Amino acid sequence: MTAATLFTPSITPQFDKASIDIDVNHHDKTTDIEQMLYDDVDDRNDDFMDEQADNILADTQSLTESVHFRKLQKKLRRQVSWAIRDFNMIEDGDVVMVCVSGGKDSYTLLDILLLLKRIAPIHFDIVAVNLDQKQPGYPEEVLPAYLNEQGIAHYILEKDTYSIVKSVVPEGKTYCSACSRLRRGSLYGFAKQIGATKIALGHHRDDMLATFFLNLFHGGALKSMPPKLLSDDKQNMLIRPLAYVEEKDIIEYSNLKEFPIIPCNLCGSQTNLQRAIINDMLREWDDAHPQRLASIFKAMQNVAPSQLADRELFDFETLSLDRDDNERLFEGDNIQAGQIESLAEIGLPVSPETQIFNPDFANAEKGSRAPKKIPTINPVI
């Protein structure tokens, strides 16, 4: 059973997606009618999940009685569900190891995944894992107390990566890269040790955008954090279920839930972090142009290799003309030729003809399914 099943209720819908022979992962290939049918199924599946979630929340405390909170939780649950479905993140029988740092993102991820586990018609297990990196002043009792109070199965790993990072990173350089590599290596090994099939990280949409611009501005590469990643040794699968979620929604959700947040003193003690500068830029854009970040994130899912300059992604060398034998004249009023002798020397016409509108070519183009677009030069987003 795949991730798509996670969002298909165990009821017989009026419309069966499988009966239409089109690719559900590429909605731009569908007709308007087909898309309406898909949207109808997705809406009814979401409604089913909403009903299950409402039943669960009916017995909870006053916090969930807030209409605003429940709307926000529904929004996050749907966005996480869509990300899991779109990238086939969680399948039946998976053991999902949720990495919990004590920050707002990982708390929110764990909370939403636990809700989905209760209402999904497939079975998957969740285990929370925290890596205590022995940073000075780290309140090591906070996370275990919270996880025990919530009845969440968990492991607390202790490894002094802090001392290693401090010893190998030169003074004045940022710790983030070295810290991340050490942490990732430890979590990879432990996931394999306990048999976890997926490692869930709390990176959200804005993290992915910030990483995109960090690589663009400082790494000379068009790349970001993928929603799903197979490790280089093919031993572990990373997933980012918050890929569609905005940070401001996570902040609000975390505040409403009153998670016991643990700040990262190692990161917070550093100044002039490039990621912090990028995050400030993104926030300014979002304030001034509310749809800009959504447009950029959409662009990350709509890559056109032929319109870039990466020779590995697109074969520019073997591009060749494929013209027909029909002579097509310039449709205009006049053509003025200059340096006629030079034109003649290279075999070009010295007095090319013009023509008025040619209905034959117009009729031929009507059969083309390619949309007619007005060319845009240097569009401003």
Swiss-Prot record:
Which residue numbers does the motif PP-loop motif cover? 101-106
Q: Which family does it belong to?
A: Belongs to the TtcA family.
What this protein is reported to do is described as: Catalyzes the ATP-dependent 2-thiolation of cytidine in position 32 of tRNA, to form 2-thiocytidine (s(2)C32). The sulfur atoms are provided by the cysteine/cysteine desulfurase (IscS) system.
Which controlled-vocabulary keywords does the entry list? Answer: 4Fe-4S, ATP-binding, Cytoplasm, Iron, Iron-sulfur, Magnesium, Metal-binding, Nucleotide-binding, RNA-binding, Transferase, tRNA processing, tRNA-binding
- Which residues, if any, are the signal sequence? none
According to the record, cofactor stoichiometry and binding are noted as: Binds 1 [4Fe-4S] cluster per subunit. The cluster is chelated by three Cys residues, the fourth Fe has a free coordination site that may bind a sulfur atom transferred from the persulfide of IscS.
Q: How does it assemble?
A: Homodimer.
Origin organism is Psychrobacter cryohalolentis (strain ATCC BAA-1226 / DSM 17306 / VKM B-2378 / K5)
Which PANTHER family does this one have? AMINOTRAN_5 DOMAIN-CONTAINING PROTEIN, SULFURTRANSFERASE-RELATED
Write the lineage as a comma-separated list: Bacteria, Pseudomonadati, Pseudomonadota, Gammaproteobacteria, Moraxellales
Name of the protein described by the UniProt record: tRNA-cytidine(32) 2-sulfurtransferase
Q: Which NCBIfam families match?
A: PRK10696.1
Q: Name the positions where [4Fe-4S] cluster binds.
A: C176, C179, C267
EC assignment: 2.8.1.-
Q: GO cellular component annotations, sorted alphabetically?
A: cytoplasm
Gene that encodes it: ttcA
Reactions this protein catalyses: cytidine(32) in tRNA + S-sulfanyl-L-cysteinyl-[cysteine desulfurase] + AH2 + ATP = 2-thiocytidine(32) in tRNA + L-cysteinyl-[cysteine desulfurase] + A + AMP + diphosphate + H(+)
Pathway in which the depicted protein is active: tRNA modification
